[in-house]
Swiss-Prot record:
Top-level taxon of the source organism: Eukaryota
Organism: Saccharomyces cerevisiae (strain ATCC 204508 / S288c)
Descriptive protein name: Replication factor C subunit 5
Encoding gene, per UniProt annotation: RFC5
Compartments where located: Nucleus
UniProt keyword Ribosomal protein, yes or no: no
Record note on quaternary structure: Replication factor C (RFC) is a heteropentamer of subunits RFC1, RFC2, RFC3, RFC4 and RFC5 and forms a complex with POL30/PCNA in the presence of ATP. Component of the RAD24-RFC complex which consists of RAD24, RFC2, RFC3, RFC4 and RFC5 and associates with the checkpoint clamp DDC1:MEC3:RAD17 complex. Component of the ELG1-RFC complex which consists of ELG1, RFC2, RFC3, RFC4 and RFC5. Component of the CTF18-RFC complex, which consists of CTF18, CTF8, DCC1, RFC2, RFC3, RFC4 and RFC5. RFC5 interacts with ECO1.
Family annotation (SUPFAM superfamilies): P-loop containing nucleoside triphosphate hydrolases, post-AAA+ oligomerization domain-like
Transmembrane segments: none
Function per UniProt: Component of ATP-dependent clamp loader (RFC and RFC-like) complexes for DNA clamps, such as the POL30/PCNA homotrimer and the checkpoint clamp DDC1:MEC3:RAD17 complex. During a clamp loading circle, the RFC:clamp complex binds to DNA and the recognition of the double-stranded/single-stranded junction stimulates ATP hydrolysis by RFC. The complex presumably provides bipartite ATP sites in which one subunit supplies a catalytic site for hydrolysis of ATP bound to the neighboring subunit. Dissociation of RFC from the clamp leaves the clamp encircling DNA.
Alphabetically ordered keywords of this record: ATP-binding, Cell cycle, DNA replication, DNA-binding, Nucleotide-binding, Nucleus
Record-listed ATP binding positions: 5, 17, 43-51, 231
PANTHER family: REPLICATION FACTOR C / DNA POLYMERASE III GAMMA-TAU SUBUNIT (PTHR11669), REPLICATION FACTOR C SUBUNIT 3 (PTHR11669:SF1)
């Protein structure tokens, strides 16, 4: 049994249900596979960047891109430290997240991509175009989290091995990406779906799952609460449906993700109790969030917006919070211990409010 967000994930370009203009553009790219450039897809979370990547590959290579396996690759640093990275692969592509290696992401770029790029692809018997395009695609998740050294290594790889490899980079923001990489890629923006588009998609899921719906207003409320994040809206719908035995009423409360509720509680603690003991309690909450694999930058972003929504704070306090958030967001990208910087942000905010 899979989550609805996976069960109803489109697997082809024709199955995509929103942003038709972008879908048609991707179809035009798949019509000329030999001329496929390096791609950089950017946009907010939950807008379907990864889904569109896989749909594009399916259009080029066929259904074989969904024959996935997970390998664990080992890398050795200059200090003889062994590191492991999960690599998702099919006969036609690889999917990696080098930022999981922290400041050692350059090693992944230099060794893994170089190894893949130096091997000419010949097993294309199941692809739609036979042997017409002998290259392998590499999807790089969280490209905006790559260090400058890794991006420099990536630039050299793109220049030297463009014949045998195509890079598809996925990121939330383009600002951390260096200019030489952006200039070598086709930039594709994936905008967030509108509330009406999300409501339409949720309505299709409701029909397929045979959920009893009192009124469609509940779907609009879910779409508004998701802030344009289609993934979150599907998870919220599934949680509400299971909690209410597949019967949703107009009075049914919107169930937000637990980690967001925890951050909102953390915000109230920061505003009401500004003390050393309170800071220690906040540290325990941060540890819990990080242990549940909530990215540190997402925690910082949600905490910042939650603090800005507090009505009792004046304009001076809010401007200081924004300034501190930008400072610690940069430090998160430079450091290895996220807990230090998140706790430092909370301490700064507490001092600001006193």
């Amino acid at each position: 049994m899979s989550l609805w967000v996976d069960k109803y994930r489109p697997k082809s370009l024709n199955a995509l249900s929103h942003n038709e203009e972008l879908t048609n553009f991707l179809k035009s790219l798949s019509d000329q596979p030999r001329d496929l450039p390096h791609l950089l897809l950017y946009g907010p979370n939950g807008t379907g960047k990864k889904t569109r990547c896989m749909a594009l590959l399916e259009s080029i290579f066929g259904p074989g891109v969904y024959r996935l396996k997970i390998d664990v690759r080992q890398f050795v640093t200059a200090s003889n430290r062994k590191l492991e990275l999960n690599v998702v692969s099919s006969p036609y592509h690889l999917e990696i997240t080098p930022s999981d290696m922290g400041n050692n992401d350059r090693i992944v770029i230099q060794e893994l991509l170089k190894e893949v790029a130096q091997m000419e692809q010949v097993d294309f018997q199941d692809s739609k175009d036979g042997l017409a395009h002998r290259y392998k695609c590499v999807i790089i998740n969280e490209a905006n989290s790559l260090t400058k050294d890794a991006q420099a290594a990536l630039r050299r790889t793109m220049e030297k091995y463009s014949k045998n490899i195509r890079l598809i980079m996925v990121c939330d923001s383009m600002s951390p990406i260096i200019a030489p990489i952006k200039s070598r890629c086709l930039l594709i923006r994936c905008p967030a779906p509108s509330d009406s588009e999300i409501s339409t998609i949720l309505s299709d899921v409701v029909t397929n799952e045979r959920i009893q719906l009192e009124t469609k207003d509940i779907l609009k409320r879910i779409a508004q609460a998701s802030n344009g994040n289609l993934r979150v809206s599907l998870l919220m719908l599934e949680s509400m449906a299971l909690n209410n035995e597949l019967a949703l009423k107009s009075s049914s409360p919107i169930i937000k993700p637990d980690w967001i509720i925890v951050i909102h509680k953390l915000t109230r603690k920061i505003v009401k109790e500004r003390s050393v003991n309170s800071l220690i309690e906040c540290r325990a909450v941060l540890y819990d969030l990080l242990a549940h694999c909530i990215p540190a930058n997402i925690i910082l972003k949600e905490l910042t917006f939650s603090l800005l929504d507090v009505e009792t704070l004046n304009t001076t306090n809010k401007s200081s919070i924004i300034e501190y958030s930008s400072v610690f967001d940069e430090r998160l990208s430079l450091g290895n211990k996220a807990i230090f910087h998140l706790e430092g942000f909370i301490a700064k905010v507490m001092c600001c409010l006193d």
